Amino acid sequence: MNDDDLPPLHPTPPGLYRHYKGGWYEVLDTVRCSETLQGMTLYRALYGGWGLWVRPAAMFAEVGVFEGCEQPRFTPHDPAQVPLADLATAQALIAHLRGLAQRRGIDLDAALRPPPPEPETCCGRGCNGCVWEGYYTALHHWREDALERVLAASR
C-alpha cells in the first residue's frame, strides 16, 4: 500500500488544548494506526506524569454531551490568550511553550531568563499585592518573550 491508497487523515492541529474536565494537554501530531489506518491524535498531558497518549482523531474533535452540557471534548487555546489565574494553567503553559520551542530547536531556559519560580510564602488571605499576583505578572512577561522567540524561529 502506498500513501495514495490511504484514507484521509483529518489532522488535529497541534497546540494547547483543555479537556472538558479541566486538564491541559498539548497536541503534538496526528498519526495513523498501522492496524486500522485510522487517524489518531498524539498528545501529552501537561500535568501529573506528563504521559503521551493517542486517541482517535474523530473522538478528540467531537462535540458531545459531557457533564450534562453539549460541549467539545477538547477545546483549543491560544497560548498568548490563556488567562493566568491558577497554578495548573501556569504550569501547563510553561510546559507547552518549552516543548514548542524545543521542537523548533530552541532551549527557552538558555535563550531567556527562566520562568518565575512558584511562590512559597502566600498566607492564603487574599492580600492586595499577593505574591501570586506578582508571579502571574512575571509569567505574563515570560510568555510574551517565549512566544516572540518561538514565532521568530518559525519564520
Task: Place the predicted regions along the sequence by residue.
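Mixed-charge, low-complexity intrinsically disordered regions
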Residues: 2-81, 96-103, 147, 151, ...
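Amphipathic alpha-helical interface surfaces
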Residues: 23, 39, 93, 123, ...
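A short, structured beta-strand/loop element
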Residues: 39-48, 110, 115-121
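Generic alpha-helix structural propensity
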Residues: 55, 69, 92, 134-137
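Residues that scaffold the ATP/ADP-binding catalytic core of kinase and kinase-like folds
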Residues: 63, 130, 138
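Intrinsic-disorder signal
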Residues: 80-119, 138-155
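Local cysteine-cluster metal-coordination motifs and their immediate loop/turn environment
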Residues: 119-134
